[in-house]
UniProtKB/Swiss-Prot annotation:
Organism name: Streptococcus sanguinis (strain SK36)
Pfam families per UniProt: Ribosomal_L10
Family, similarity comment: Belongs to the universal ribosomal protein uL10 family.
Listed GO CC annotations: large ribosomal subunit
UniProt lineage: Bacteria, Bacillati, Bacillota, Bacilli, Lactobacillales
Name of the molecule in the record: Large ribosomal subunit protein uL10
Signal peptide coordinates: none
Keywords: Ribonucleoprotein, Ribosomal protein, RNA-binding, rRNA-binding
GO terms under biological process: translation
Gene3D superfamilies: 3.30.70.1730
Function: Forms part of the ribosomal stalk, playing a central role in the interaction of the ribosome with GTP-bound translation factors.
Length: 166
């Protein structure tokens, strides 16, 4: 193999390792058997949620995982592998891929990594059941607003009682 090809592959390993280090979550799938139309729809959905989806050779993925400190992830790089990286939303890749897999039997989730820790297929599927980032933020906001709303209602009730008494 020529030195130019080796250098190019080394650059690719470095680039993938950097993506793995920077990613909030990584989901590895076996997309063998998806039609071109299904793959196009899947890629569009992932892109809409700012999730990067790539089919990368297993040898490159193994080396990149080792370089990124995710050595245990290397064991799932068997057979055709596609990888979804998300830097912002931890839940998005798992949720989109899991929802898509329900309608496309050919797509199989293999495992991944969450916040730099290797995750099994079961953990990725559990992550997929959580609401997305916006949903979690709205839940948090409603929990934070509830005490303030209750105090405001209590103050209003006291004011109404004083008006009625006067």
């Amino acid at each position: 193999m020529s030195e130019a090809i080796i250098a190019k592959k080394a650059e690719l390993v470095d680039a993938v390792a950097e993506k793995m280090k920077a990613a909030a979550s990584i989901v590895v799938v076996d997309a063998r058997g998806l039609t071109v139309e299904q793959d196009t729809v899947l890629r569009r959905e992932l892109r809409g949620s700012e999730v990067e989806y790539k089919v990368i050779k297993n040898s490159i993925l193994r080396r990149a995982a080792e370089k990124a400190g995710l050595e245990d992830l290397a064991s799932i790089f068997v057979g055709p592998s596609a990888v979804a990286f998300s830097n912002e939303d931890v839940v998005a890749p798992a949720k989109i891929l899991n929802d898509f897999a329900k309608n496309a039997d050919a797509l199989e989730i293999k495992g991944g990594a969450i916040e730099g820790a290797v995750a099994s297929k079961e953990e990725i599927l559990a992550l997929a059941t959580l609401p997305n980032r916006e949903g979690l933020l709205s839940m948090l906001l409603s929990v934070l607003q509830a005490p303030v709303r209750n105090v405001a209602l209590a103050v209003k009730a006291v004011a109404d009682n004083k008006e009625d008494a006067a």
